């Protein structure tokens, strides 16, 4: 997400729950980093954005982080819901949407592919072109044989993932 944001010209603030994860993400060159493990995400985002808040928030975690993210979004900002690796599906407070003129957008690639196949294909082609041009360099940090899918999935549910975690499907 950091790398894609940078390629698209955004000022990117990367946030993570540990300094170890932030050290990892720095190789993607975010403009700033925030450790939200202390529960002060809003204050830190506001300090980095001249008290405005973030225009777009990418949230793959959900749970308590989602609750904090809703409070540090800028006027007319968008909160992109990618997943719920925290294990808790949060609720979006309508009063925050009203007060901030913000919106929440669910990003579900599987459904997007089904409902808008042409747009999906166009987006995929753009990503592949960026990759071929060397603008996107995903880092695979762990790879598992397909039989160990539960182990790979647990990396996410235990919030231990850094970089890309993949499954190997070998033809026989």
Model features per residue range: what roles?
Residues 1-38:
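Mid-domain Rossmann-like dinucleotide-binding core that forms the NAD(H)/NADP(H) cofactor-binding site
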Residues 40-51:
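Short amphipathic alpha-helix with an adjacent loop that forms part of the alpha/beta core around
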Residues 145:
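A conserved short coil-to-beta-strand element within the FAD-binding core of flavoproteins
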Residues 133-142, 150-172:
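C-terminal capping/lid region of NAD(P)-dependent oxidoreductase domains
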Residues 50, 74, 160:
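Short conserved AdoMet
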Residues 34, 57-58:
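N-terminal Rossmann-like NAD(P) cofactor-binding module of classical short-chain dehydrogenase/reductase
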Residues 25, 64-135, 168-172:
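Glycine-rich phosphate-binding loop and adjacent beta-alpha segment
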Residues 30, 53-54, 97, 136, ...:
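Local beta-strand N-terminus motif with an aromatic residue
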């Amino acid at each position: 997400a950091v790398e894609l944001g940078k390629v698209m010209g955004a000022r990117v603030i990367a946030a993570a729950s540990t300094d170890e994860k932030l050290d990892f993400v720095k190789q993607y060159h975010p403009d700033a980093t925030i450790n939200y493990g202390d529960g002060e995400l809003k204050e830190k985002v506001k300090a980095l954005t001249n008290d405005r808040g973030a225009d777009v928030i990418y949230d793959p975690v959900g749970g308590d982080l989602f609750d904090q993210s809703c409070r540090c979004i800028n006027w007319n900002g968008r909160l992109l819901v990618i997943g719920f690796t925290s294990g808790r599906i949060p609720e979006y407070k309508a009063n925050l949407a009203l007060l901030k003129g913000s919106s929440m957008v669910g990003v579900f690639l599987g459904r997007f592919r089904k409902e808008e196949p042409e747009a999906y294909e166009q987006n995929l082609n753009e990503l592949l072109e960026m990759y071929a041009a060397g603008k996107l360099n995903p880092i695979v940090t762990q790879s598992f044989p397909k039989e160990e899918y539960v182990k790979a999935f647990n990396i996410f549910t235990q919030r231990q993932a850094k970089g890309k975690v993949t499954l190997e499907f070998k033809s026989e």
